[in-house]
Design a protein with these regions (language model features):
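Membrane-aqueous junction of the first/signal-anchor transmembrane helix
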Residues: 1-42
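Juxtadomain coupling helices with adjacent low-complexity linkers
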Residues: 29-32, 150-182
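Short linear interaction motifs
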Residues: 43-49, 132
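Short regulatory alpha-helical segment in sensory/regulatory domains of signaling proteins that mediates
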Residues: 50-62, 67-70, 177-180
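GAF sensory/regulatory domain recognition
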Residues: 66-97
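Acidic/proline- and glycine-rich, intrinsically disordered low-complexity segments
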Residues: 85-115
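Signal-transducing coupling segments at domain and membrane junctions
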Residues: 113-134
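A short, aliphatic-rich beta-strand micro-motif
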Residues: 134-143
Length: 182
């Protein structure tokens, strides 16, 4: 009986004066959003630091990450979320914002083969013309459910490095993937 009375009193309080509950929920949502923004900024900073190390380590001209997302009309799209480049390379990040994945053959190739090392024109002639890279090393980024969420790539304007450290690249990719999934 006491429980019923408490429920009735609590219900009346909510019915006649719900604003404290709404205010509390709003504050909770705002705090949660702030924490997510801080975590995202920290993760992005760590990813940029890793990419800077990898750009030097693999002697690339550009290193980048394209992240997949749903576009305006619910088409599968991608955006170049991260791009670092050396002094002789021009940025291309803004050419790859909200583009439809079907415009290029590279995403489909990676969906089937998971990675690519070689001449860019062999896998995607359109990309080789539009961003001046002759060679690329790239790998599909997958989440923990094995769903494709993006592409990690290193671009070379003239030639691939003489010594490719494929085992290092695989280990570095795993480290980067963990950060992307934070």
């Amino acid at each position: 009986m006491l429980t019923l009375i408490l429920i009735i009193l609590f219900s009346c309080r909510i019915y006649y004066n719900p604003s404290p509950l709404f205010e509390e929920y709003k504050n909770y949502r705002n705090q949660k959003h702030e924490l997510e923004l801080v975590q995202c900024a920290n993760t992005d900073k760590k990813i940029k630091q890793l990419l800077s190390i990898y750009l030097d380590k693999y002697q690339g001209n550009r290193i980048w990450i394209i992240q997949y997302h749903r576009g305006i009309n619910d088409y599968m799209c991608g955006s170049m979320r991260f791009e670092l480049y050396d002094k002789q390379t021009k940025p291309i990040k803004y050419q790859y914002t909200d583009f439809n994945l079907s415009w290029y053959t590279l995403p489909d190739y990676l969906r089937i083969h998971d990675s690519f090392i070689g001449k860019l024109e062999e896998v995607d002639p359109v990309l080789s013309i539009s961003n001046s890279a002759k060679y690329i090393i790239c790998k599909l980024i997958r989440d923990y459910n094995n769903v494709s969420i993006g592409i990690f790539g290193i671009s070379y304007l003239d030639k691939l490095p003489n010594k490719l450290l494929e085992t290092d690249l695989q280990q570095d990719y795993i480290e980067l993937q963990k950060l992307m999934l934070e």
